[in-house]
């Protein structure tokens, strides 16, 4: 059984015991998009396996940027009925859904942690974090002053994403750029970072991931909900082209993300985590846990 003692939360919560100060457990609100809602399948189960009571709530709009979040906040100021977000919540294993806006969500509970992130297609642009990210931080501090604001570092795409060609660089350079942008934003505002983009990069390096013309090579990004043999197809020129998602996490990636978040937010021994979905091998889970644990000690590489 894992234990909850410190980590990011201990700094603000004073080493809350596993029983928590609230019957709902540690309350985490994610103001995000498709790069955060993917935590809903596995993070509650990992937390339960660790004996950590968790109330996890996701605000989701696909591809939602920091600028759009703030546009929504301003729209809500003139229209209280404006509820553009899908809300998914898992409180001690009980799941609910609804519609909500950012301001109402921030006041819904006394959140212990509120997480934010940039939309992935802007994440490599440091200028995209300002002023909208700063404004969102100010709104969170206004409506949820007790909450610890934590930034999730998102990940770089696989080589098949056409946007990389448009931008003029590959996955590694995208990572270096977003890594620097998130680091600068977090430092400016005094936030902790969940280094999942770095975790994905470490996975690619240490597995190692070897892309081929018709394979993701073991990556945790790409090929979601598709069998390996269905991820690529021949085009009219008989060249292999992707036949699936090439930038979201696949199912294994979602489990990996849950482990990295668990290690970042709580003082847990991931080696003791018994929960593992059947599509993750023992060796894969071992490497995921090793990377997550190492990044907890040295999160910014």
Question: Model regions: which residues?
Answer:
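Bacterial N-terminal signal peptides
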Residues: 2-11
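Bacterial Sec-dependent signal peptides at the C-terminal "C-region" and cleavage site
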Residues: 10-24
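Residues that mark the start of a beta-strand
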Residues: 25-27, 55
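Short hydrophobic segments within beta-strands
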Residues: 29-31, 152
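Conserved SGNH/GDSL esterase-like catalytic core that processes O-acyl groups on lipids
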Residues: 37-133, 139
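Alpha-helical cap/lid subdomain in secreted, periplasmic
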Residues: 99-251, 263, 272
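Short, hydrophobic/amphipathic alpha-helical patches that form generic packing surfaces
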Residues: 252-267
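C-terminal accessory extensions appended to soluble enzyme cores
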Residues: 265-301
């Amino acid at each position: 059984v894992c234990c909850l003692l410190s980590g990011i939360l201990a700094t603000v919560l004073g080493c809350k015991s596993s029983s928590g100060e609230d019957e709902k457990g540690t309350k985490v609100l994610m103001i995000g998009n498709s790069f955060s809602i993917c935590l809903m399948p596995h993070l509650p189960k990992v937390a339960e396996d660790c004996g950590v009571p968790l109330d996890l709530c996701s605000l989701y709009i696909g591809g939602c940027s920091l600028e759009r979040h703030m546009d929504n906040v301003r729209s809500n100021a003139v229209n209280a009925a404006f509820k553009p977000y899908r809300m998914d919540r898992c409180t001690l294993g009980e799941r609910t859904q609804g519609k909500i806006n950012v301001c109402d969500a921030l006041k819904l509970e006394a959140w212990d942690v509120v997480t934010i992130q940039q939309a992935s297609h802007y994440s490599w642009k440091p200028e995209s974090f300002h002023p909208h990210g700063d404004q969102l931080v100010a709104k969170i501090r206004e409506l949820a002053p007790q909450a610890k604001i934590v930034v999730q570092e998102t990940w770089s795409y696989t080589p098949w994403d056409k946007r990389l060609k448009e931008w003029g660089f590959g996955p590694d350079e995208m990572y270096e750029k977003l890594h620097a942008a998130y680091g600068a934003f977090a430092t400016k505002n005094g936030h902790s970072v969940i280094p999942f983009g770095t975790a994905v990069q470490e996975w690619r390096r240490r597995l190692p991931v070897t892309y081929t013309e018709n394979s993701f090579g073991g990556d945790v990004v790409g090929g979601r909900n598709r069998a390996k043999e269905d991820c690529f197809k021949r085009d009219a020129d008989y060249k292999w082209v992707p036949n699936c998602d090439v930038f979201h996490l696949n199912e294994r990636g979602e489990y990996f993300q849950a482990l990295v978040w668990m290690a970042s937010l709580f003082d847990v021994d991931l080696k003791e985590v018994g929960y593992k979905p059947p599509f993750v091998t023992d060796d894969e889970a071992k490497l995921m846990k090793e990377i997550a644990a190492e990044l907890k000690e040295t999160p910014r590489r």
